[in-house]
Amino acid sequence: MARLQFQLKVDGLEDESLVVRGFEGQESLSDSVWRCEPCYGFRYQVDLASALSNLTAEQFVDQTAHLTILRDGQVVQQINGIVRQLSKGDTGHRHTFYSLTLVPALERLSLRSNSRIFQQQSVPEIISILLQEMGIEDYAFALKRECAQREFCVQYRETDLQFLHRIAAEEGLVYSHLHEAQKHTLLFTDSSDSQPKLAKPVPYNALAGGEINLPYVVDLQFKTTAQVSHTELKDYSFKKPAYGFTQRTQGKDIAYQQPNYEHFDAPGRYKDDANGKAFSQIRLEYLRRDALLADAKSDEPLLLAGVRFDLQDHLDHAMNRDWLVVQANHQGTQPQALQEEGGSGATTYSNQLKLIPAHITWRARPCAKPQVDGPMIATVVGPQGEEIYCDNFGRVKVHFPWDRYSSSNEKSSCWVRVAQEWAGSQYGSMAIPRVGHEVIVSFLNGDPDQPIITGRTYHATNTAPYALPDHKTKTVLRTETHQGQGYNELSFEDQAGSEQILLHAQKDWDALIEHDHTEVIRHDQHLTVDNDRFTRIQRNQHLTVEGEVRSKIALDSSHEVGASLQHKVGQRIAVEAGKEISLKSGAKIVVEAGAELTLKAGGSFVKVDAGGVHLVGPAINLNAGGSAGSGSAYGGQLAAAPRMLAQAKPVAELVQPDIAASMQSGAARVIDVASLPTMMPSSANNTANDEPVAEEKTPERILKSDLLKPSDELEKLAKRQASAYRQGNHSDEVKLLQEALIKLGFDLGKAGADGDFGSKTKTAIEQFQKSYQPSHQTHPSYSIGAVDGIVGKGTLLALDEALMDGWVYENNIYQIWPLGKTSEKYESAGRGPGVISTGNGDYGGASYGCYQMSSNLGVVQKYIQSSKFKEFFSGLNPATKEFNVVWQDIASRYPQEFREEQHQFIKRTHYDIQIGHLRGKGLLFEHNRAAVHDLIWSTSVQFGGRTNLIFNALNGQNMESMTDKDIIILVQDYKLVNTERLFKSSPSWWSDLKKRAVSEKKALLELEIDGLEVDIK
């Protein structure tokens, strides 16, 4: 008969201080409930006795404790945790009784509540941040599926643990704990295959009354329950408004039940097919997690939650298989530990188990997402100096008042859509909220991850255009001149007797009327033109004036009539000229008067009337010589034509946006996890008119290679009618792109063409973008574009052309990595040499260029002194508007030279100095590859060329036995732990710096896996 013994050790107490009377506890995969208390992986109640009656809570609570189970003097199980609660009971003859609650360190996260925003981070990255903030370093991930980065993930009025549970369950992650002598490791998995397994099978004791000397399982009861047979999720994305986003997953092993138990839900909380497929599968696995479930009893203490084991010796051979423990309840009694209880009874241990077949994946219970009770106020933000900051969809960035971590800049939020008064296909209204505006933000379905701006408000500093309530009858639409002074305005005054419509254009007012324009003015019209006025009428002008016409022309007046000029006057015409009146006709001039005609000049006159012709003058000369007087010739000026509108085309003639051509309908129905049917456009099943489909002409395809040409989705991308492919995508099209890369000579590793766009695929795309020179034989006019690892139209056409040309990549053994690329990614997000950061909250002040050279620390000043562009900055100081304008102007005019000069300056003043500094301390890195050199570069940029950080992180290590991976982990973890000591920044920047340390560690480890050489120049 095996002899059992239980021991408990609390850090800081003598081993002999406590004896275990008994314990009860529960372990579970992820969270559960035990005795109406939450159980976060495990929870034990341990009853103790001690000869010491003066033990205090300070000696127990929040301390690490270890419960050990021994069999025949050998340790068979250890439960490591922290003491959450201590109860002190009665004192007997020799002992005082205590009871404590043992829980995982993870439970500490339940005591912190927060609201904050995570951007462009995956769930494992977010979880690691939560754990590290609490000082939990013993955790690990064993995941089969790569979790996509989340554009915008909000922890909203939740404890850290509630948030962790929620996002982990969304991605299908469950956790368990691996116990050791001095610690317990939190293990996250997404597949039963990743759970630890006992090395030896556990026997089943089927004989009542029989004895067995080894731990065993008894009372196995296997239950089969009808559950949901399939799931269907549906969602929506404004980027593909007509696309179905439907994902359907069919359950397996359901022959025993009806197949029509459907679980439908919308929205499904995803925006692409790859995530939708995974989420649908995860939802089904959760709903069916107890469809095949077994209950059993055991005295094997190794059977903890999350452990797989093989069962043997069961009379039903179907039960002799591998099982996964999803929940275990443990009991142990040790009555002989106390002398005053007479030592009656033996030490016992037993447990009750909840098991599932190990081929089934257990999913955690989904947690309700916190609902935003209603709209909230936010402020529109953007980069320093920007008044209007938006993307091609008119989305803006905002800062919420509760956000304690961001710096109220373009990194404060995701792009947030803005509701407009009217929105159609290239018609409607558009008013972009500007930086500094206060907006009302609502949330789709109450989801804090999906903000949308639904209104705008004034406040104490952003006031209305007119003072209120003095102008309460005025309705106003006033804009403000961008990067200048002034405004445009349309306002309506509704005060009785003072009604008015006011239109103010700060510069130009252009109008295009496609047909008639009718105006009726019941009173006066006044028109003042301060400069010139031009009018052009293509046909006729009709003018009727019921009263007078008065004109005053300060200079000349010219009239040119192509045909006849006719005036009819009812009474008289009076023309007066200060000097001369000239009349000239090419043929004749006829002057006719009904009664009298008079010509008068110089005291003489000729008068013609009914009485005859009268000539009066000092002398009358007939054929007496002399000459006729002459008048001035016509000198009128041609009228200048008015200028035309800059854009006179009607809206109906505008080119429709690409998104309209990419609209799809229908549903992607997933039959099993390995296949996804190809989505067909709605036009594939319905013709747009009454013409037979057979008569429609098939347009010529752009793609030409046999590999890529058959894909309709890739053809759409070639026409810029579909989105680009990037890391995190999963589809048949990605698989085709991977096959193309392999055919062109790129190595994608063991996974090969698996349809998952991972880091290997991204690296291969970047290598292709760098190395391929377009021949333009297949596609005459295109550009590959930036080296970004994204397959857009240009890269797709290049791949197609390379396949047609038979091009092969010939440098696939040791690829060359550009030194400093990782640093540039994290310093300036790869935005180029002209980028400027404001430095709000940063000890370094405003920062410049690819590597964000500091102004407060004098780095950018040193760079200017050595720059060939030095004269451009003469008399200018960094962090001023004038300096910034010159900096960005140089970047736009000389982008390559400016970038290379910055690179060489940082190499000379930071990287080379740090390499020499480390060499002087005996640390040599000549044989390390790109990942380590990028680590050194990035650290020197962030902490200075003479920093001791790398030396301190590696001090005492055996460098000869260390791998590149070891070096990266030690240095980045050192940064994470010492952030607040190393940086004189604001708390919000500390948070960003910690996030960077975690993210950069991941990026460098991925680079280390690629094994690339580095170009040190």
UniProtKB/Swiss-Prot annotation:
UniProt keyword Nucleus, yes or no: no
SUPFAM superfamilies referenced in this protein's UniProt entry, alphabetically: gp5 N-terminal domain-like, PGBD-like, Phage fibre proteins, Phage tail proteins
NCBIfam families (alphabetical): vgr_GE (TIGR01646), VI_Rhs_Vgr (TIGR03361)
EC code: 3.2.1.-
Summary of the knockout phenotype: Mutants are unable to secrete TseL.
Main location: secreted
Protein name: Type VI secretion system spike protein VgrG3
Active site: 842
Function: Part of the type VI secretion system specialized secretion system, which delivers several virulence factors in both prokaryotic and eukaryotic cells during infection. Forms the spike at the tip of the elongating tube formed by haemolysin co-regulated protein Hcp. Allows the delivery of the TseL antibacterial toxin to target cells where it exerts its toxicity. Additionally, acts directly as an effector and targets the cell wall peptidoglycan layer of prey cells for degradation via its C-terminus. Toxicity is counteracted by a cognate immunity protein TsiV3.
Family note: Belongs to the VgrG protein family.
InterPro entries: Gp5/Vgr_OB, Gp5_Vgr_C, Peptidoglycan-bd-like, PGBD-like_sf, PGBDSf, T6SS_RhsGE_Vgr_subset, T6SS_Vgr_RhsGE, T6SS_VgrG/RHS
Catalytic EC class: hydrolase
One annotated Gene Ontology cellular component of this protein: extracellular region
Segments crossing the lipid bilayer: none
Domain of life according to the entry: Bacteria
Keywords: Hydrolase, Secreted
Subcellular location: Secreted
